Amino acid sequence: MTPVLDITDVTFRRDGKQIIDGISLTVQSGEHWALLGPNGAGKSTLLGFCAAVTFPTTGTVHVLGGQMGRTDLSVLRRSIGHVNPRHRLQYPLTVREVVLTGITATIDIAAHWTPTPEQVCRADELIDTVGLSARADAIWPTLSQGERGRTLIARALIADPQLLLLDEPTTGLDVAAREQLLETLDTLDVSHPDMASILVTHHLEELPTSTTHALLISQGRTVASGLAHEVVNTEHVSEAFAHPVVVGFQDGRWSARAKASSRVL
């Protein structure tokens, strides 16, 4: 089976600085990966490889069977969904209109484009999936951060992606909104069983229960990679974040806290 994503020994340098140093990652259909690491670890750069928008300095990147540099990237990108909570709109679109922009891959409704009745129906189905049916006609500025996050998930799904990328999707959310968004992500394991996903975060509490695998990085290098329940542990997280922590796991969710000896008294 061809992997959804196959990154082999990639490096990336910018302005003489080594940002990524020999990372490899293979993602299969239906797997849900967490990309964990501290600020400045190289997570955003690595996600750029996954999205087929950033070229490595050395190494190879295969996305959906196509190798970057040897295939039409615009075709690949149509099958990649991207959820970014910093998504900016120029116009006050409704929830439904925002979701429909996922078809055209534009920030706003594309000029001279009108969605078909089938596309509008599909948008409404996805809006219902993320629990926002009552807000379908609400305009973007009136939405809470949590509602915006769930709208962007629906937007990413409308093009039926094979790979879903989530760039710190719970940024700026309170606890209730975070939990609602994570519950939404967990439902995708059932509604889109073949879709693979990669979620970027530096907080273990933001990992949904559907997480199957994890890649922990630090200073552009791999600390650990594999099944989430095997690699998201006290040893690896402490190494990745260069700080002694205790990792907990209960009811399918992870947590992290400082070791007692490292707390400031």
Task: Name the predicted role of every residue range.
Residues 51:
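Helix-to-loop junction immediately C-terminal to a conserved catalytic motif
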Residues 160:
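Conserved catalytic motifs of ABC-family nucleotide-binding domains
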Residues 36-38:
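The feature captures the beta-strand-to-loop junction immediately N-terminal to the Walker
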Residues 164-168:
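Catalytic Walker B motif of ABC-type/P-loop ATPase nucleotide-binding domains
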Residues 67-81, 109-116:
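ABC ATPase NBD coupling module
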Residues 139-143:
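Conserved ABC ATPase signature
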Residues 59-68:
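Conserved ABC transporter NBD signature motif
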